[in-house]
Each structure stands twice: as structure tokens, then as C-alpha cells.
Amino acid sequence: MATDTAQAENQMESRRDFLFIATGAVAVLGTAAVIWPLIDQMAPDAATIAAGAPLDIDIGSLAAGQQIIVKWRGHPIFIVNRPPDALKILQDPALVGLLSDPNSQARQQPGYAYNWHRSLQPEFAVLVGICTHLGCIPTYEPNRNQLAPGWLGGWFCACHGSKYDLAGRVFRNVPAPYNLPVPPYRFINDKTIRIGENPTGEKFELDSVIQL
């Protein structure tokens, strides 16, 4: 009986670890403002999570500017619905000039994410949420001037000050050497992303990136 109870508690912990959500100026991971959605159909069982199997994520209710974080193969995966103004900023020469690898020359993404938005569809960013310096988890800071005057939105790693834009491209003069990795993923339909599976005809493994 005690064993059954412990197993149930462990499974619940795994499900709670699977998905959380933050919006607007709410920082992710490490604040008391994290909101836990009650979306059972999006939470796989513990065995699925542990196996690292492909993971289907419903993005139908993901509002513009909102981020969700899911857990795949033990890694936090950032999924963000980038609004039109954020996409314009990604192409702004004033921002591009501040980035270390604006054209994604380093192999930190699959071929189908080798573009200015580093994604299959411009609106949706899908990134491994691990700082390429020492493995901390950056916080989502999407709003202009939210982090500091002149900030245009992106992620900030509080461990050592590394910064990334809303495409996961790393800024110059920070400790992190590479852009945030893009995991293998594809769209099942307009409202569902499958993480861990490439589009038809594409080949990419997360282990092939330079820095995870």
C-alpha cells in the first residue's frame, strides 16, 4: 500500500513537472508567479516523459506573447507565440548588430530552422531552454525595456548575465557562446506541435548540436 502511494505521488510530481505557463512580464522558473494549468490531456504519464518519446503539445490556446514550457528528454522546451511586433524586432538591424550569431552559423538548430526566426513557422518559437554557458534556465522577459532600458524582449540568464533575443539568438559580450538549441519538432496540425520528431524528409538529432 505504501509502495502504491509512493508511485502515485511520483507520477503526480512528473505530471506537474511537465507543463507550466507564464505570460507577459511574468518570469518563468524561479518565481512565485508561475501558473499551473489544469490541462490533463497535455500531461503524459511518467513513463512517456522518462522514455523521451515524441511529445504532442496543444498550442491552440497559446496567446500572442505567451510562453509555455514543457519537459522533453529531461530538458525544458520553450514554446512562444511571437506577435507581429516581436517578429519585426527580430529583423531590426539595431538588434541584429547586437547579436553574436544572428544568422545561426553555429549548428544549434536543424536545417528547417536555419532562418531569421529559427523556426518552422515565424510565429512559434520552439527552443531548448538551457543557457549555453553553464546550463542554467533563462527567464522569459518579452516586453520592451522590461529587463533594462533598450531591452527588446527575449530571455535572460540570471546565473551569469547571458541574454538571448526572441529567436534564442545570443547577444555579444555575454558568457554564453552559442544560440539556444532548437529541438527536432514538427506541426501535426495548426494547433499541435510534436516535439522529438522531424518534418517528413528531414533528419536532425538534438545530440548533434554544438552546445546543449
Q: Where in the sequence are the language-model features?
A:
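Extracytoplasmic/periplasmic/luminal assembly and interaction segments
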Residues: 66-113
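Rieske [2Fe-2S] iron-sulfur-binding domain
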Residues: 96-204, 208-211
